[in-house]
Structures are given as C-alpha cells and as structure tokens.
C-alpha cells in the first residue's frame, strides 16, 4: 500500500493535479526545492526532504536526496524482517511511491550558447540514483518517470486501496532503466564528442562512444524473408515528418518490407513542393510525378511503369481526395501514404480493408544519422540531404538547355537521388519516363531505363536524363541520346569528363554538371 510518496521533477507537467489526487487518497508528500514550493503554493501539505532527513540541502543543491533516510526507505524489502527491523531501528519510514524526472540535459546541450559548464550542471545525480533504487525494488515501490503514467497509477490505486500491482510496477521499473540508460547515453555521446578544446561549438558530429536509443513499436510477422524474424523500433528523437510517426487508419499489419519501402516513398515525395506522387517497388521509384493535384500526379506516376506499380507502395504529399482514391483503388496496392485522407477517400478504401492507409504529417525533419550495419560494426554518416540549387549548376556543352529542359533536368536529378545506384532516370513534363536502377554498369542502367519507357509506350524524344554519378565512358551517354534524350544532368568528376562532354557536343545535346554525387546502396 502506498502511504508516502517522494516527488521531485524537472518537467512539472500535471504534477500538481497528480499530487493533489495522492493527497486526497491520504498519501504523505515529500518533495525537494522547486517542486516542493510549487506543491506548497498550490495549498498541498508537503514536507521538504531537508526537513524530513534533518540534513539541509548543500553544495548549491547538488546534495539533496543522497541520504540513508531517503534510500533506506526506498530500497528496503518489505518481505525481509531484517530490512524492516533496520528501518525501525533508525527511524526510517518506507517511501512507497517515487515520482522523479531528470534535469533537462538533452534540451540544455541543444542550445547554441550551451557551455561545457552548463552541460555539467545539468547532469542529474540524485534523480537517477533514486530512480534506480526504486526500480530495483519495484516489487515494493512504484516508480514514475513519465507524466503520461500518472493517470495509470492513480486509476490502479483508486481501484485497489492505494495499491499498485506488480505487473504495473514491473513495467514502470523497466521504463526507468530504459530512461536512465538513455540519459547516461546522451551524456556520454556529448562528452565524448568534445574535442581537445572542450568547446560546445567545436564538438565532433561523431562521438568517440555512440549510444543509440530506440523503443520497440511492434514485432513484425517476419523480416525481409519469411525465415527471418524482425521488429520495428522508433528513434526516441524521431523528427517531425518522419515515417516512424505514422498513424495507420486501416489495413493489415505492416511488414518489414512495407516499412522499408514506405520510408523510401515518403522521403522522396516530401521533397517536392508541387502536388506529387511516388510509387515504390523494392525501395526503388518506379514512377514519380508532379501534377495539378493528387489524382493528376498519380495518373502520371502510374503511367511510367504500370507493370512494376502492381503491389507497390504509393506516397502523396497532398491530401488523398476521392478522385485520387478512385484512381488508386483500380490497382493492387500494398500501402498508401499521405498527410491526410478525405472522408470520401476513406470510404473508397473501406471496401478494401487489406490496403494499409498511413497518415504522416509533413515535416522537413531528418534523422541525425544514416546508419548501416556491417559485420561487427556500424557505418555512420550524415544524410544525403543536399539539394543542388540552379545557381550551382554548370553548363559544360556548347548548347545551353532551354528553360523547359532545365525544369526537367532538376526534376530528374531530384528523383535520381532516391534510385539505387547505378541510376539513370529519363524524365519529361514533370514525370519519370524510364528508370534504370541498381545495375553494376551505368550503360546497362541506361539501356534498362530506355527499355522500360518502350514497354510503357512512352516516347523519350526530347527527354531529360539524370545520372546519379559521373559517366565513366561515353557509352552510357550514347545510349540515352539514341533513345531520344536532348539534355543530361550528372555530377561530373570522371577522368574522362572531357571525352563525355565532347560526345555531348557531338550529339548536339546540353549537359549540366552538379558537382554532387548521389550514390545509393
């Protein structure tokens, strides 16, 4: 039974109401510093920890709760007579509920003007110590680190005579250990990122010790293949607009491949300003287009490669209305992603309950790192978020691209970044016309992209081509020109750039260099 609670929080969200409810249930309240003042100002009967222990706070508040009367009351096992006798001998009442959250270390180091001294002062000592003590003794002590759990604890106390059951205590304890591990991980990441200057502004992006924190969203039926097990985890620092923030409106559970492909589709589609649609198959775009609205963009994207679009993942950067829903519903689709779905669109898919509808709020946030596991290690890099501006482009041929060609080139370049290397993308009039992906030689990607367009009945005459990396030889360029391309955008940087540029002049086409490569493996 909970008779006494110690409350000490930095995040004071909901704490007054929670403490009042505890007091109404007859629970004695202990508290520290600002939390104690807040509760007292709210008219609640609260005892300062310094008065409780008979030992004043000291060292500018660094020592408040590090006292046997606090930790003895938390750690004592109620089922061991010798523990209870020790408490009685030393006049230590039990502390049955601990409500603590920690100094805002992560928020502090996120400030541009943070100093090492600021960071150090926001490393909580007493809080984690109490949390770990209570979590260790969770059989007898209820410990709350998250304001979202206040209601859960109160409901259970009211239903069970001020008692919280073991399953809840165990869950709350595991939450504490996860929280303190993440807290210590953030401290380690920060301190080991400091260079010899020990200055906040000059710290390394890549700390000497890297701690990552993820919470499990769900177990998956299987991994990339049925013989592989899998689960999906969410980054605790998930940025706005990221796939992990999805809300599923209907459909079967997402699979491993659904989630991987959905991420590829969503990351691509949200880079466009105009209404856009992206169709993904095996993490590669098989159709991308912008249009007047979602329905128009979908019709153009689907036209690129109707065969590959079967069973694909489709993403929009605008609301899916009834017209777009009716168009998509004619095809077999695994997942449909959009910022929102109109009520009429939801009705269209109500008859197709296997279709997974995901809503994700648009946002330009990105993961802090791009991660790839290798045997016994982890490759960590910044995201490929570089968008080339028109002013950075360099025309290297005798012929300049027309304004329309430049628009097509920029569209093609944006798409090519999301195609597996080696990537060749034909585009025109705001849509992809042929996509060649994942080939070991660039010339083969060019041939495949051309064949894809032919199979879809699309002409490549006057089209624009993007290559994610330089042309090592002129053969790839010859293929795209023979297919009908009149302009090409590529990074440049090959030892044979002059030969490739000369070939472009020979063909009378325009070539633009970006100076930026977009390998994708």
Curated annotation (Swiss-Prot):
SMART domains: AICARFT_IMPCHas, MGS. Residues 1-145 form the MGS-like domain. Its EC number is 2.1.2.3, 3.5.4.10. InterPro entries: AICAR_Tfase_dup_dom_sf, Cytidine_deaminase-like, MGS-like_dom, MGS-like_dom_sf, PurH-like. Keywords: Hydrolase, Multifunctional enzyme, Purine biosynthesis, Transferase. Gene3D superfamilies: 3.40.140.20, Methylglyoxal synthase-like domain. It catalyses: (6R)-10-formyltetrahydrofolate + 5-amino-1-(5-phospho-beta-D-ribosyl)imidazole-4-carboxamide = 5-formamido-1-(5-phospho-D-ribosyl)imidazole-4-carboxamide + (6S)-5,6,7,8-tetrahydrofolate; IMP + H2O = 5-formamido-1-(5-phospho-D-ribosyl)imidazole-4-carboxamide. Pfam families: AICARFT_IMPCHas, MGS. One of its GO terms (biological process) is 'de novo' IMP biosynthetic process. Transmembrane segments: none annotated. SUPFAM superfamilies: Cytidine deaminase-like, Methylglyoxal synthase-like. Pathway: Purine metabolism; IMP biosynthesis via de novo pathway; 5-formamido-1-(5-phospho-D-ribosyl)imidazole-4-carboxamide from 5-amino-1-(5-phospho-D-ribosyl)imidazole-4-carboxamide (10-formyl THF route): step 1/1; Purine metabolism; IMP biosynthesis via de novo pathway; IMP from 5-formamido-1-(5-phospho-D-ribosyl)imidazole-4-carboxamide: step 1/1. One of its GO terms (cellular component) is cytosol. GO terms for molecular function: IMP cyclohydrolase activity; phosphoribosylaminoimidazolecarboxamide formyltransferase activity. The IMP cyclohydrolase activity resides in the N-terminal region. Belongs to the PurH family. This is Bifunctional purine biosynthesis protein PurH.
């Amino acid at each position: 039974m909970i008779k006494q609670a110690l409350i000490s929080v930095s995040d004071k969200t909901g704490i007054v109401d929670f403490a009042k409810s505890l007091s109404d249930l007859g629970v004695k309240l202990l508290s520290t510093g600002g939390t104690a003042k807040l509760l007292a100002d709210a008219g609640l009967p609260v005892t300062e920890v310094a008065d409780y222990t008979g030992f004043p706070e000291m060292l500018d508040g660094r020592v408040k709760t590090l006292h046997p009367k606090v930790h003895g009351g938390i750690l004592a096992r109620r089922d061991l007579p010798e523990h209870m006798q020790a408490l009685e001998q030393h006049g230590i009442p039990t502390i049955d509920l601990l409500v603590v959250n920690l100094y805002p270390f992560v928020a502090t180091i996120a400030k541009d003007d943070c100093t090492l001294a600021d960071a150090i002062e926001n490393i909580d000592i007493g809080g984690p110590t109490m949390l770990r003590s209570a979590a260790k003794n969770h059989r007898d002590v209820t410990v709350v680190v998250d304001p979202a759990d206040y209601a859960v604890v109160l409901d259970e106390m009211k239903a069970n005579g001020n008692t919280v059951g073991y399953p809840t205590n165990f869950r709350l304890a595991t939450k504490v250990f996860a929280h303190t591990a993440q807290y210590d991980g953030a401290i380690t990441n920060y301190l080991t990122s400091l260079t010899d200057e020990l200055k906040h502004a000059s710290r390394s992006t890549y700390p000497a010790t890297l701690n990552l924190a993820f919470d499990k969203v769900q177990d998956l039926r299987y991994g990339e293949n049925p013989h592989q097990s899998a689960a999906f985890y969410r980054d605790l620092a998930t940025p706005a607009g990221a796939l992990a923030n999805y809300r599923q409106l209907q459909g079967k559970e997402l699979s491993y491949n659904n989630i991987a492909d959905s991420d590829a589709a969503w990351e691509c589609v949200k880079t466009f300003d105009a209404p856009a649609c992206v169709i993904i198959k095996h993490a590669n775009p098989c159709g991308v287009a912008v249009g007047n609205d979602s329905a128009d963009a979908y019709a153009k994207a689907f036209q690129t490669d109707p065969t590959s679009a079967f069973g694909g993942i489709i993403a929009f950067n605008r609301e899916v209305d009834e017209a777009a829903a009716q168009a998509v519903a004619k095809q077999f689709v695994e997942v449909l992603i959009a910022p929102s779905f109109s009520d009429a669109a939801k009705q269209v898919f109500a008859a197709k309950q296997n279709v997974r509808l995901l809503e994700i709020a648009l946002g330009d946030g990105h993961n802090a790192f791009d991660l790839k596991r290798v045997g016994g290690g982890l490759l960590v890099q910044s995201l490929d978020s570089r968008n080339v501006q028109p002013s950075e482009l360099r025309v290297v041929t005798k012929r300049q691209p027309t304004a329309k060609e430049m628009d097509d080139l920029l569209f093609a370049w944006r798409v090519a970044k999301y195609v597996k290397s080696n990537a060749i993308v034909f585009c025109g009039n705001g849509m992809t016309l042929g996509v060649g992906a994942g080939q070991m030689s660039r010339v083969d990607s060019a041939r495949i992209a051309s064949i894809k367009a032919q199979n879809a009945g699309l002409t490549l005459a006057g089209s624009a081509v993007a290559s994610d990396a330089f042309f090592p030889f002129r053969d790839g360029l010859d293929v795209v020109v023979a297919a009908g391309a009149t302009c090409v955008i590529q990074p440049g940087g090959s030892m044979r750039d002059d030969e490739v540029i000369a070939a472009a002049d020979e063909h009378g086409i325009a070539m633009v260099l970006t100076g930026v490569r977009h390998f994708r493996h």
